[in-house]
Design a protein with these regions (language model features):
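Conserved phosphate-coupling serine/threonine residues in phosphotransfer and NTP-handling enzymes
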Residues: 11, 109-111
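Structural motif corresponding to alpha-helix initiation and N-cap regions
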Residues: 36-39, 89, 93, 140-143, ...
Length: 205
């Protein structure tokens, strides 16, 4: 193994408490098209592609309104997270520091452009990562973005760490082992490794 690629939401942090207010501030200007969201609502869609999030949270909105709501929510999300951050899981920096001494670290997340940068900006963790990617920049699926990062950085034997079924499928698409973060937001049908807290990676690798 030469590298570890991380999902972000439900794997390294939980941003929902920070962003729920911003989401509802945007939604309030679309009376009738969308209902306020809760932390539980947001945790239930974490890790999904942005268009799918819109369909699940705002099923009654027409396509044009839904797109506008999502665009504004995504912009608000990046702004709020860059100013306030999210809730990091226990020992995140300690774990990243230890792992980065042995492996190259990366982030591939199903988020909009600017989201990973907001995570970096507030928490100052970018020094531990070599590269990152998301569909907001590439328009690609998570599995394709994992492959892109692998090719761009000449990775031979990475693993992918994530918390939902989509992460498992993306790792499978990329042909690499999947580490299931069971403390995150979802359940998966299978995995190669499992951790019940982030620092479990130090015992695995």
């Amino acid at each position: 193994m030469d590298s570890i690629i991380f999902d972000l939401d439900g794997t390294l942090w939980d941003p929902t408490e920070t962003v729920v207010g911003g989401w509802n501030q945007v939604i309030s200007s679309y009376t009738g098209a969308a209902k306020e969201v809760t932390i539980d609502n947001l945790q239930g869609i974490m890790g999904l592609p942005v268009p799918e999030v819109g369909r699940r949270l705002f099923p009654d909105a027409d396509e044009e309104s839904r797109q506008k709501i999502m665009d504004e929510c995504c912009d608000m999300e990046c702004l709020v997270l860059s100013q306030q951050g999210g809730r990091l899981y226990a020992r995140v920096e300690e774990v990243l520091q230890a792992l980065s001494a042995k492996y190259k670290l990366f982030i591939v997340s199903n988020c909009q452009a600017g989201y990973i940068e907001a995570f970096y900006e507030y928490h100052q963790l970018q020094k531990y990562f070599t590269d990152y990617e998301n569909p907001g920049r590439t328009g690609l699926s998570k599995g394709e973005n994992i492959r892109l990062v692998m090719d761009r950085n000449h990775l031979m034997s990475p693993v992918y760490v994530g918390d939902i079924e989509g992460d498992r499928k993306a790792a499978g698409f990329a042909g690499i082992p999947f580490v299931y973060a069971s403390y995150g937001f979802g359940e998966v049908s299978s995995y190669d490794y499992v951790i019940d807290r982030l620092d479990g990676l130090l015992e695995l690798f």
